[in-house]
């Protein structure tokens, strides 16, 4: 069964449901704000921010209340703008060990929706906090729903099978068809010329005494 690329993307959790920046950068001791947008259907759902390279094992650091009220936890804050269908996560007093993979997520029945965001903290001077005094992000009690961590890989492979491979086959077929067409034209012209020559010879024999 053929699926268009748009329908194919919609068939995977998280695709087009929530979107965010692939990478954000902030200075050490400074702050960074990440804005993630979501579909209107998730307007009143709780939003969260978790840390970890793998979706299935990341730790939720902060979660909204399902309203537009700002929630704070240590150096983190989250605010949901339901009218604009977006929410913002602010990380303050950035540290070098805050550099990691994070996820913008939507809490829902069944499988949560999420998108990956890379956070990169760069140094701006020598007067920085020592790593011995750095504290980990607070972890919100409760577990997140477990989903496949290979979501993006599966999306790529499905696009490859349903879009790129058929397109390549169509292209090869078109080239072969054009090649056969160009080969037939000289053959038909040769037959036409041969028949014309034979007709001319027969006509000449009939006219001659």
Curated annotation (Swiss-Prot):
Q: Where in the cell is it found?
A: Cell membrane
Where on the chain is Phosphoserine found, per UniProt? 196
Tissue and organ expression note = Expressed in myeloid cells (at protein level).
Signal peptide: which range, if any?
Answer: 1-17
Residue intervals of the Ig-like V-type domain = 18-120
Against SUPFAM superfamilies, the record matches this protein to: Immunoglobulin
| Gene3D superfamilies, sorted | Immunoglobulins (2.60.40.10)
CDD domains given for it?
IgV_pIgR_like (cd05716)
This protein's major location comes to: membrane
User: What Pfam families does the record point to?
Assistant: V-set
The protein's UniProt keywords, in alphabetical order, are: Cell membrane, Disulfide bond, Glycoprotein, Immunity, Immunoglobulin domain, Membrane, Phosphoprotein, Receptor, Signal, Transmembrane, Transmembrane helix
Q: What is this protein called?
A: CMRF35-like molecule 7
């Amino acid at each position: 069964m053929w699926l268009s690329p748009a329908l194919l993307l919609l068939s995977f959790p998280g695709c087009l449901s929530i979107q965010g920046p692939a990478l954000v950068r902030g200075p050490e001791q400074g702050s960074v704000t990440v804005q993630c947008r979501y579909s209107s259907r998730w307007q009143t759902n709780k939003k969260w921010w978790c840390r970890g390279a793998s979706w299935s094992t990341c730790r939720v650091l902060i979660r909204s209340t399902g309203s537009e009220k700002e929630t704070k936890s240590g150096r983190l804050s989250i605010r949901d703008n339901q009218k604009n269908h977006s929410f913002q996560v602010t990380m303050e007093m950035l540290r070098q060990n805050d550099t990691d993979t994070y996820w913008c997520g939507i809490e829902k029945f069944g499988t949560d929706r999420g998108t990956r965001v890379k956070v990169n903290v760069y140094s701006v001077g020598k007067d920085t906090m020592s790593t011995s005094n750095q504290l980990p992000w607070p972890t919100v009690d409760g577990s997140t729903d477990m989903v496949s961590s290979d979501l993006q890989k599966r999306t790529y492979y499905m696009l490859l099978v349903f879009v790129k491979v058929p397109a390549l086959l169509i292209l090869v077929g078109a080239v072969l068809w054009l090649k056969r067409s160009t080969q037939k034209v000289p053959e038909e012209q040769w037959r036409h010329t041969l028949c014309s020559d034979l007709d001319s010879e027969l006509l000449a024999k009939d006219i001659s005494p």
